[in-house]
């Protein structure tokens, strides 16, 4: 029986309040309105960004809400006026949309899009309302995606149609972390062949930077992390050497000083994949004078500020930032999926655990314990 135009009752992991475990609830999902798409989510990754909002540290965090932003699913129904997505399409929800008409999309200078930014930041659909209810209460959306639900509703401009032979339990992870790191090296920094790269933080994003650097032809890729259990995966993903700053530094040397010493004046490119403002400074200051480029990928706590001596920039170092790897979400993500399908991008190797929806809190636990690169939840 068709569910088109009808309210769907399904399971979702609801975040009723900050700092509390998610609760599996029966929720009601309204039909898509004009310009919207309703998706049956099959798989979703669990990311540190979900945890950040659940912790109560996110200034845009609104409760109760349905978290999740690394999803993969199939279009169940479409609203009036939707033309680029059809029922049955395999899609990845996008937390950075691509409308193609705003000044950001038409600038050819950024992958950001302003079309629905205000309402998305309020946990709402573009018309200022939500599509979720639970126990008679309105439930807010998260990052415009809310993939911790068996069904979700997105604006059409927040859906990337993907090839049907791409396994959704793997490519769902391209909705955030892997693409973020890979694109930071390929698109934002534009790492050059034969260059030296330093990566601070070897989680899923940092390992993806390594993949991007390899794809660009970098000669030397230095992975930096206090947790040496990450060095094995780091090697598998392309790092050529490693530094543990808690034990490997010469006496009296900072990590940036040590990197400058061992790279003949500094690295060509560095990437901060942690979200620590002190590490961001180190990542800039380990860059080579005259041309070194440091890209901030990690998300720092709200209100945190970065600092360095202006002379670091005056003498030619460049500080950049990257969101979703600079990847235009609807038009460029399919080519990254193609790269995975052509076995030129590792994705399967990130999946450490797979859980059913009712064990989603365990996925958060193993992430906090540093035991997983990514956990995938089967909805």
UniProtKB/Swiss-Prot annotation:
Binding residues annotated for Zn(2+) 1, in chain numbering: 47, 69, 176
The enzyme's E.C. designation: 1.1.1.1, 1.1.1.-, 1.1.1.284
Annotated catalysed reactions: a primary alcohol + NAD(+) = an aldehyde + NADH + H(+); a secondary alcohol + NAD(+) = a ketone + NADH + H(+); S-(hydroxymethyl)glutathione + NADP(+) = S-formylglutathione + NADPH + H(+); S-(hydroxymethyl)glutathione + NAD(+) = S-formylglutathione + NADH + H(+)
Entry-linked InterPro entries: ADH-like_C (IPR013149), ADH-like_N (IPR013154), ADH_3 (IPR014183), ADH_Zn_CS (IPR002328), GroES-like_sf (IPR011032), NAD(P)-bd_dom_sf (IPR036291)
Database matches in Gene3D superfamilies: Medium-chain alcohol dehydrogenases, catalytic domain, NAD(P)-binding Rossmann-like Domain
Binding site for Zn(2+) 2: 99, 102, 105, 113
Enzyme category, top tier: oxidoreductase
Domain of life: Eukaryota
GO CC, any one term: cytosol
GO-annotated molecular function: alcohol dehydrogenase (NAD+) activity; S-(hydroxymethyl)glutathione dehydrogenase (NAD+) activity; S-(hydroxymethyl)glutathione dehydrogenase (NADP+) activity; S-(hydroxymethyl)glutathione dehydrogenase [NAD(P)+] activity; zinc ion binding
Note accompanying the cofactor annotation: Binds 2 Zn(2+) ions per subunit.
Location (main, coarse): cytoplasm
UniProt KW Protease keyword: no
Localization per record: Cytoplasm
Gene Ontology process terms (BP): formaldehyde catabolic process
Names of required cofactors: Zn(2+)
Keywords assigned by UniProt, alphabetized: Cytoplasm, Metal-binding, NAD, Oxidoreductase, Zinc
Family that this chain belongs to: Belongs to the zinc-containing alcohol dehydrogenase family. Class-III subfamily.
Subunit comment: Homodimer.
Reported function: Class-III ADH is remarkably ineffective in oxidizing ethanol, but it readily catalyzes the oxidation of long-chain primary alcohols and the oxidation of S-(hydroxymethyl) glutathione.
NCBIfam families per the UniProt record, alphabetical: adh_III_F_hyde
Protein name, UniProt field: Alcohol dehydrogenase class-3
């Amino acid at each position: 029986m068709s569910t088109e135009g009808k309210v769907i009752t399904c399971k979702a992991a609801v975040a009723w309040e900050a700092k509390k475990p998610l609760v599996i609830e029966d929720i009601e999902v309204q039909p898509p309105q004009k310009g919207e798409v309703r998706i049956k989510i099959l798989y979703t990754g669990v990311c540190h960004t979900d945890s950040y909002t659940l912790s109560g540290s996110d200034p845009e965090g609104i409760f109760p809400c349905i978290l999740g932003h690394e999803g993969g699913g199939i279009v169940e129904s479409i609203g009036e006026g939707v033309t680029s997505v059809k029922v049955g399409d395999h899609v990845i929800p996008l937390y950075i949309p691509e409308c193609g008409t705003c000044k950001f999309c038409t600038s050819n200078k950024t992958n950001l899009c302003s079309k629905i930014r205000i309402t998305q930041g309020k946990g709402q659909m573009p018309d200022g309302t939500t599509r979720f209810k639970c126990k008679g209460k309105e439930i807010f959306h998260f990052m415009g995606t809310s993939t911790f639900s068996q069904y979700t509703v997105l604006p059409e401009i927040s859906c990337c149609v993907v090839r049907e032979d791409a396994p959704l339990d793997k490519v769902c992870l391209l909705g955030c972390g892997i693409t973020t790191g890979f694109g930071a090296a390929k698109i934002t920094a534009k790492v050059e062949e034969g260059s030296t790269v330093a990566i601070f933080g070897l989680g899923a994003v940092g390992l993806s930077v390594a993949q991007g650097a390899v794809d660009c032809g970098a000669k030397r890729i230095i992975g930096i992390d206090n947790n040496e259990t990450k060095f094995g995966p780091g090697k598998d993903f392309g790092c050529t050497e490693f530094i543990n700053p808690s034990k490997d530094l010469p006496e009296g040397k900072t990590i940036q000083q040590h990197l400058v010493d061992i790279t003949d004046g500094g690295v060509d490119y560095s990437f901060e994949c942690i979200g620590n403002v002190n590490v961001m400074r180190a990542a800039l200051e380990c860059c080579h004078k005259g041309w070194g480029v440091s890209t901030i990928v990690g998300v720092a706590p709200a209100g945190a500020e970065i600092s360095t001596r202006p002379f670091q920039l005056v003498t030619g170092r460049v500080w950049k930032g990257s969101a979703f790897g600079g990847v235009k979400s609807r038009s460029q993500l399919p080519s990254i999926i193609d790269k995975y399908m052509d076995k030129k991008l590792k994705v399967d190797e990130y999946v450490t655990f797979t859980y059913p929806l009712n064990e989603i809190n365990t996925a958060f636990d193993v992430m906090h314990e540093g035991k997983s690169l990514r956990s995938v939840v089967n909805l």
